[in-house]
């Protein structure tokens, strides 16, 4: 366990590959020596472990096990536990089927590429007027547009800030009898996106092909507009310890006791979306779920301020990403910042609670659901963006966009 943790923290090695290598050498130890004693190992044992991996795993996995076996041996040599000579992984890295031009590789590439009809459907939806699109539609089509502009991991979308667009003017070259020269007469505007690379490289500008610039600009503009109110709420919470005066908040003093309807508005529950009966019933459920009194004149904004801040996401003002090696993005800067239930048609948006979509949110909208209803053996009725817009059961994964761009580049 200590070795696995050491390699994960210090060398960023994949835990699964490290464990598979340990298991391979463990098997050889037990077969040859009847016990696990690393001091008895010889070079031939590592050859046998690599051969075992070749027999039990597919070529790409076996290669990585062999690579990890070399790392393990080098580690043992460094600590002087073993006095063996250097060892080379005998397993060759399999040819990249994305590049090789044989029939099998061609079929492999085709299976990895996105359905052309699905891409055209997404393009058609993206081209619609903004007024025709729901926030969920804007999220999906804009995210896909960005993924088609640069071969980035889909999970890195959510590290983007609202000011991710980078523009600069560059001097182009022209032909002359002396070859290509910069004569100062041609200035071209180029556009890039500041992406955050998860593998410890920080933010880096990836320039966009000129044909994609209008699409990227529109996608980012839509996302900025969609995230404007959540980002503003986060900003208000950052700059002051008072109750954040968002759009629904009643214009009353902080210490004035509130009616139930005012409490609901202050906590981001838009009562105007319901009739009187629905507002009464749904409002009670909402308040009870948050341990807020349902009677009139029980609490003021000062009281609600404490309750609201206690419900803020972990690590606020920063978004609590599960990946990204500690990337720091404030909610007030996050391009994909949203409110709770903002994408849910059956529930009202909560305008005082922050939420961030994830890679799963995007994938769920690109492929027919596999989720089952809670407590039942039947699928939920969640529709993909294709189904919502009448394009049938198209299915596509976020990783396929990256394969498409890499295939075009090759």
Give residue ranges: language-model regions.
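Active-site-adjacent bridging/hinge elements
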Residues: 40-46, 115-126, 372-387
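DNA breakage-rejoining catalytic core of tyrosine-based enzymes
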Residues: 95-124, 201-214
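Long amphipathic alpha-helical scaffold regions
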Residues: 47-63, 168-200
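Short, basic (Lys/Arg/His-rich) helix/loop patches that form interaction surfaces
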Residues: 32, 128-134, 150, 250-403, ...
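Extracellular/surface-associated beta-sandwich interaction domains
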Residues: 183-185, 189-192, 197-247, 252-253, ...
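Charge-rich, intrinsically disordered N-terminal extensions
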Residues: 1-108, 145, 159, 218, ...
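Basic, Lys/Arg- and aromatic-enriched nucleic-acid-binding interface segment
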Residues: 117-150, 154, 400-402
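Short, charged phosphate-coordinating catalytic segments
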Residues: 80-83, 147-179, 410
